Amino acid sequence: MRPVAQERAPPVALRNKRKNKMNEIKDSKKCLQRWLERIQEKRPLLECLTNVVTINDVANVILACGASPVMADAADEVPDFVNIASGVVINVGTMQNRGSYEIAMRYAQEYGKPVVLDPVGVGAAKARTTLTTALLRRYPCAVIRGNASEIRTLAEGAGETKGVDAAVGDAVTEETIPARLAVVKAVANRWHCTVAMSGAIDLISDGKVSYACRNGVPWMSNVTGTGCSLTGLTGAFAAVAEKSEMAEAAAYATAMMGMAGEAAYAKAKSLGLGSFRVYLIDALSTILEQDVQPRLELL
Protein backbone atom coordinates (compact mmCIF):
# COMPACT_ATOMS: atom_id res chain seq x y z
CA MET A 1 0.00 0.00 0.00
CA ARG A 2 1.11 3.60 -0.33
CA PRO A 3 3.29 4.63 2.65
CA VAL A 4 1.42 5.78 5.73
CA ALA A 5 2.87 7.52 8.74
CA GLN A 6 2.17 4.58 11.00
CA GLU A 7 3.50 1.06 11.28
CA ARG A 8 1.19 -1.92 11.03
CA ALA A 9 0.69 -3.79 14.25
CA PRO A 10 1.82 -7.42 14.16
CA PRO A 11 -0.91 -9.75 12.90
CA VAL A 12 -1.30 -11.54 16.25
CA ALA A 13 -1.73 -8.25 18.08
CA LEU A 14 -4.33 -7.16 15.58
CA ARG A 15 -6.23 -10.40 15.92
CA ASN A 16 -6.23 -10.08 19.69
CA LYS A 17 -7.59 -6.55 19.45
CA ARG A 18 -10.41 -7.47 17.07
CA LYS A 19 -13.80 -6.53 18.44
CA ASN A 20 -16.06 -8.67 16.27
CA LYS A 21 -14.68 -12.02 15.19
CA MET A 22 -18.13 -13.19 14.12
CA ASN A 23 -17.75 -11.25 10.88
CA GLU A 24 -14.43 -12.79 9.86
CA ILE A 25 -14.77 -14.31 6.39
CA LYS A 26 -14.36 -18.09 6.40
CA ASP A 27 -12.57 -20.00 3.62
CA SER A 28 -11.18 -16.71 2.38
CA LYS A 29 -8.17 -18.33 0.72
CA LYS A 30 -10.49 -20.50 -1.36
CA CYS A 31 -12.35 -17.34 -2.36
CA LEU A 32 -9.04 -15.76 -3.38
CA GLN A 33 -8.23 -18.90 -5.38
CA ARG A 34 -11.52 -18.57 -7.28
CA TRP A 35 -10.74 -14.95 -8.13
CA LEU A 36 -7.28 -15.88 -9.39
CA GLU A 37 -8.67 -18.76 -11.44
CA ARG A 38 -11.05 -16.30 -13.06
CA ILE A 39 -8.20 -13.90 -13.84
CA GLN A 40 -5.96 -16.65 -15.19
CA GLU A 41 -8.77 -18.05 -17.32
CA LYS A 42 -9.71 -14.71 -18.86
CA ARG A 43 -6.20 -13.16 -18.84
CA PRO A 44 -7.60 -9.61 -18.97
CA LEU A 45 -5.63 -6.93 -20.78
CA LEU A 46 -5.26 -3.76 -18.72
CA GLU A 47 -4.59 -0.37 -20.25
CA CYS A 48 -2.43 1.30 -17.59
CA LEU A 49 -1.71 5.01 -17.39
CA THR A 50 0.58 4.96 -14.40
CA ASN A 51 3.50 7.04 -13.18
CA VAL A 52 7.05 6.74 -14.45
CA VAL A 53 8.50 6.06 -11.00
CA THR A 54 6.79 2.69 -10.54
CA ILE A 55 5.71 1.60 -14.02
CA ASN A 56 7.92 -1.52 -14.11
CA ASP A 57 6.72 -2.79 -10.74
CA VAL A 58 3.08 -2.21 -11.68
CA ALA A 59 3.47 -4.18 -14.91
CA ASN A 60 5.20 -7.07 -13.13
CA VAL A 61 2.55 -7.27 -10.40
CA ILE A 62 -0.20 -7.42 -13.02
CA LEU A 63 1.67 -10.21 -14.80
CA ALA A 64 2.23 -12.04 -11.51
CA CYS A 65 -1.51 -12.47 -10.93
CA GLY A 66 -2.17 -13.73 -14.45
CA ALA A 67 -3.37 -10.57 -16.19
CA SER A 68 -1.63 -8.68 -19.01
CA PRO A 69 -0.59 -5.00 -18.88
CA VAL A 70 -0.09 -2.47 -21.63
CA MET A 71 1.50 0.78 -20.44
CA ALA A 72 0.47 3.02 -23.34
CA ASP A 73 -0.26 6.64 -22.43
CA ALA A 74 0.13 8.52 -25.73
CA ALA A 75 -3.13 10.36 -26.39
CA ASP A 76 -3.48 9.18 -29.98
CA GLU A 77 -3.32 5.48 -29.09
CA VAL A 78 -5.20 5.41 -25.78
CA PRO A 79 -8.63 4.97 -27.46
CA ASP A 80 -7.46 1.89 -29.36
CA PHE A 81 -5.99 0.24 -26.28
CA VAL A 82 -9.03 1.03 -24.13
CA ASN A 83 -11.17 -0.57 -26.82
CA ILE A 84 -9.30 -3.89 -26.71
CA ALA A 85 -8.63 -3.86 -22.95
CA SER A 86 -10.77 -5.47 -20.27
CA GLY A 87 -10.11 -2.64 -17.84
CA VAL A 88 -8.30 0.66 -17.32
CA VAL A 89 -5.90 1.67 -14.53
CA ILE A 90 -5.14 5.37 -14.00
CA ASN A 91 -2.51 6.62 -11.55
CA VAL A 92 -1.99 10.39 -11.38
CA GLY A 93 1.34 10.12 -9.55
CA THR A 94 3.55 12.14 -11.89
CA MET A 95 0.76 13.64 -14.04
CA GLN A 96 2.66 13.16 -17.29
CA ASN A 97 0.40 13.12 -20.37
CA ARG A 98 -2.46 14.16 -18.11
CA GLY A 99 -4.69 14.77 -21.11
CA SER A 100 -4.65 11.03 -21.70
CA TYR A 101 -6.45 10.42 -18.40
CA GLU A 102 -9.62 12.09 -19.63
CA ILE A 103 -9.38 10.35 -23.00
CA ALA A 104 -9.02 6.97 -21.28
CA MET A 105 -11.97 7.57 -18.97
CA ARG A 106 -14.15 8.89 -21.79
CA TYR A 107 -13.52 5.85 -23.96
CA ALA A 108 -13.81 3.50 -20.99
CA GLN A 109 -17.29 4.91 -20.45
CA GLU A 110 -18.12 4.51 -24.15
CA TYR A 111 -16.85 0.92 -24.30
CA GLY A 112 -18.10 -0.12 -20.85
CA LYS A 113 -14.68 -0.84 -19.32
CA PRO A 114 -14.11 -0.60 -15.53
CA VAL A 115 -11.71 2.13 -14.40
CA VAL A 116 -9.55 1.89 -11.26
CA LEU A 117 -8.30 5.34 -10.25
CA ASP A 118 -5.40 6.05 -7.89
CA PRO A 119 -5.59 9.73 -6.81
CA VAL A 120 -1.94 9.98 -5.77
CA GLY A 121 -1.18 13.09 -3.74
CA VAL A 122 -4.68 14.54 -3.94
CA GLY A 123 -4.83 17.19 -1.25
CA ALA A 124 -1.10 17.90 -1.47
CA ALA A 125 -1.24 20.03 -4.62
CA LYS A 126 -4.13 22.02 -6.07
CA ALA A 127 -3.49 20.93 -9.67
CA ARG A 128 -3.86 17.21 -9.00
CA THR A 129 -6.83 17.75 -6.72
CA THR A 130 -8.59 19.79 -9.40
CA LEU A 131 -7.72 17.27 -12.11
CA THR A 132 -8.91 14.25 -10.14
CA THR A 133 -12.20 15.75 -9.01
CA ALA A 134 -12.90 16.95 -12.56
CA LEU A 135 -12.38 13.43 -13.89
CA LEU A 136 -14.71 11.97 -11.27
CA ARG A 137 -17.41 14.53 -12.01
CA ARG A 138 -17.37 13.74 -15.72
CA TYR A 139 -16.82 10.00 -15.91
CA PRO A 140 -17.77 6.86 -13.96
CA CYS A 141 -15.18 4.95 -11.98
CA ALA A 142 -15.36 1.36 -10.74
CA VAL A 143 -12.83 1.66 -7.89
CA ILE A 144 -10.97 4.53 -6.25
CA ARG A 145 -7.92 3.31 -4.33
CA GLY A 146 -5.82 5.61 -2.19
CA ASN A 147 -4.49 6.31 1.27
CA ALA A 148 -6.57 7.79 4.08
CA SER A 149 -5.64 11.42 3.39
CA GLU A 150 -6.39 11.12 -0.32
CA ILE A 151 -9.76 9.50 0.31
CA ARG A 152 -10.66 12.11 2.92
CA THR A 153 -9.82 14.86 0.43
CA LEU A 154 -12.23 13.32 -2.07
CA ALA A 155 -14.91 13.25 0.63
CA GLU A 156 -14.41 16.76 1.96
CA GLY A 157 -12.78 18.60 -0.93
CA ALA A 158 -9.73 19.47 1.17
CA GLY A 159 -7.10 17.47 2.98
CA GLU A 160 -3.57 17.35 4.30
CA THR A 161 -1.02 14.87 2.99
CA LYS A 162 2.72 14.45 3.42
CA GLY A 163 3.57 14.48 -0.26
CA VAL A 164 2.00 11.23 -1.46
CA ASP A 165 1.87 9.75 2.07
CA ALA A 166 -1.08 9.80 4.45
CA ALA A 167 -1.02 12.35 7.26
CA VAL A 168 -0.51 11.00 10.79
CA GLY A 169 -3.94 12.22 11.85
CA ASP A 170 -5.62 10.11 9.17
CA ALA A 171 -4.19 6.78 10.36
CA VAL A 172 -6.56 3.80 10.35
CA THR A 173 -6.49 2.05 13.73
CA GLU A 174 -8.94 -0.17 15.58
CA GLU A 175 -10.22 2.93 17.37
CA THR A 176 -10.64 5.02 14.22
CA ILE A 177 -12.28 2.37 12.02
CA PRO A 178 -15.83 3.78 12.44
CA ALA A 179 -14.78 7.32 11.52
CA ARG A 180 -12.57 6.24 8.61
CA LEU A 181 -15.24 3.85 7.31
CA ALA A 182 -17.73 6.71 7.31
CA VAL A 183 -15.34 8.64 5.05
CA VAL A 184 -14.91 5.66 2.73
CA LYS A 185 -18.68 5.23 2.46
CA ALA A 186 -19.14 8.95 1.85
CA VAL A 187 -16.74 8.86 -1.11
CA ALA A 188 -18.33 5.65 -2.42
CA ASN A 189 -21.78 7.22 -2.29
CA ARG A 190 -20.61 10.55 -3.69
CA TRP A 191 -18.93 9.02 -6.74
CA HIS A 192 -21.08 5.86 -7.01
CA CYS A 193 -18.17 3.42 -6.89
CA THR A 194 -16.15 1.15 -4.65
CA VAL A 195 -13.51 2.85 -2.50
CA ALA A 196 -10.41 1.16 -1.05
CA MET A 197 -8.59 3.09 1.68
CA SER A 198 -5.09 1.79 2.43
CA GLY A 199 -3.60 1.99 5.89
CA ALA A 200 -2.49 -0.12 8.83
CA ILE A 201 -5.97 -1.57 8.46
CA ASP A 202 -7.38 -1.35 4.94
CA LEU A 203 -11.04 -0.41 4.51
CA ILE A 204 -13.06 -1.20 1.39
CA SER A 205 -16.70 -0.30 0.70
CA ASP A 206 -19.19 0.33 -2.08
CA GLY A 207 -21.40 2.22 0.37
CA LYS A 208 -23.37 -0.89 1.29
CA VAL A 209 -20.94 -3.80 1.66
CA SER A 210 -17.80 -3.01 3.66
CA TYR A 211 -14.61 -4.91 4.47
CA ALA A 212 -11.63 -4.52 6.77
CA CYS A 213 -8.35 -6.13 5.73
CA ARG A 214 -5.56 -6.70 8.24
CA ASN A 215 -2.89 -8.15 5.97
CA GLY A 216 0.49 -6.50 5.39
CA VAL A 217 3.73 -5.50 7.12
CA PRO A 218 5.39 -2.13 7.91
CA TRP A 219 8.14 -2.70 5.33
CA MET A 220 5.58 -2.17 2.58
CA SER A 221 5.65 1.52 3.48
CA ASN A 222 9.40 1.66 2.84
CA VAL A 223 9.41 0.42 -0.75
CA THR A 224 8.15 2.80 -3.40
CA GLY A 225 5.51 1.39 -5.69
CA THR A 226 3.60 -0.93 -3.38
CA GLY A 227 0.54 1.32 -3.49
CA CYS A 228 0.76 1.79 -7.25
CA SER A 229 1.19 -1.96 -7.64
CA LEU A 230 -1.90 -2.59 -5.53
CA THR A 231 -3.83 -0.28 -7.85
CA GLY A 232 -2.70 -2.37 -10.82
CA LEU A 233 -3.61 -5.58 -9.01
CA THR A 234 -7.03 -4.13 -8.18
CA GLY A 235 -7.43 -3.36 -11.87
CA ALA A 236 -6.90 -7.03 -12.70
CA PHE A 237 -9.56 -8.12 -10.22
CA ALA A 238 -11.98 -5.41 -11.35
CA ALA A 239 -11.55 -6.43 -14.99
CA VAL A 240 -13.08 -9.85 -14.31
CA ALA A 241 -15.71 -8.71 -11.79
CA GLU A 242 -19.37 -7.96 -12.24
CA LYS A 243 -20.45 -4.52 -11.09
CA SER A 244 -22.06 -6.02 -7.99
CA GLU A 245 -18.75 -7.73 -7.10
CA MET A 246 -16.47 -4.68 -7.17
CA ALA A 247 -16.17 -4.32 -3.40
CA GLU A 248 -15.29 -8.00 -3.03
CA ALA A 249 -12.83 -7.78 -5.92
CA ALA A 250 -11.06 -4.79 -4.36
CA ALA A 251 -11.03 -6.48 -0.95
CA TYR A 252 -9.36 -9.63 -2.24
CA ALA A 253 -6.84 -7.67 -4.31
CA THR A 254 -5.97 -5.73 -1.15
CA ALA A 255 -5.65 -8.91 0.89
CA MET A 256 -3.48 -10.55 -1.76
CA MET A 257 -1.00 -7.68 -1.76
CA GLY A 258 -0.82 -7.69 2.03
CA MET A 259 -0.38 -11.47 2.10
CA ALA A 260 2.49 -11.17 -0.37
CA GLY A 261 4.07 -8.56 1.89
CA GLU A 262 3.89 -10.93 4.84
CA ALA A 263 5.41 -13.80 2.86
CA ALA A 264 8.15 -11.57 1.43
CA TYR A 265 9.04 -10.18 4.85
CA ALA A 266 9.46 -13.69 6.27
CA LYS A 267 12.20 -14.31 3.69
CA ALA A 268 13.79 -10.87 3.48
CA LYS A 269 13.78 -9.57 7.07
CA SER A 270 17.43 -10.51 7.57
CA LEU A 271 18.45 -9.20 4.13
CA GLY A 272 16.86 -5.81 3.57
CA LEU A 273 14.43 -3.81 1.48
CA GLY A 274 15.96 -4.65 -1.90
CA SER A 275 15.41 -8.34 -1.34
CA PHE A 276 11.95 -7.62 0.06
CA ARG A 277 10.96 -5.91 -3.20
CA VAL A 278 12.03 -8.94 -5.22
CA TYR A 279 10.42 -11.44 -2.86
CA LEU A 280 7.19 -9.45 -3.04
CA ILE A 281 6.84 -10.24 -6.75
CA ASP A 282 7.80 -13.86 -6.06
CA ALA A 283 5.11 -14.14 -3.40
CA LEU A 284 2.44 -12.58 -5.61
CA SER A 285 3.14 -15.09 -8.37
CA THR A 286 2.89 -18.03 -5.94
CA ILE A 287 0.45 -16.60 -3.41
CA LEU A 288 -1.71 -19.71 -3.04
CA GLU A 289 1.39 -21.73 -2.12
CA GLN A 290 2.46 -19.27 0.58
CA ASP A 291 1.75 -19.93 4.26
CA VAL A 292 -0.37 -16.80 4.63
CA GLN A 293 -4.12 -16.24 4.80
CA PRO A 294 -6.43 -13.38 3.80
CA ARG A 295 -7.52 -11.61 6.99
CA LEU A 296 -10.76 -10.09 5.75
CA GLU A 297 -13.75 -9.14 7.84
CA LEU A 298 -17.19 -7.86 6.89
CA LEU A 299 -18.05 -4.69 8.78
Q: Where are each of the predicted segments found?
A:
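Conserved post-catalytic alpha-helical subdomain immediately downstream of the catalytic base
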Residues: T234-V278
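Glycine/small-residue-rich loop that forms an oxyanion/phosphate-binding "nest" at active or ligand-binding sites
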Residues: A104-G146
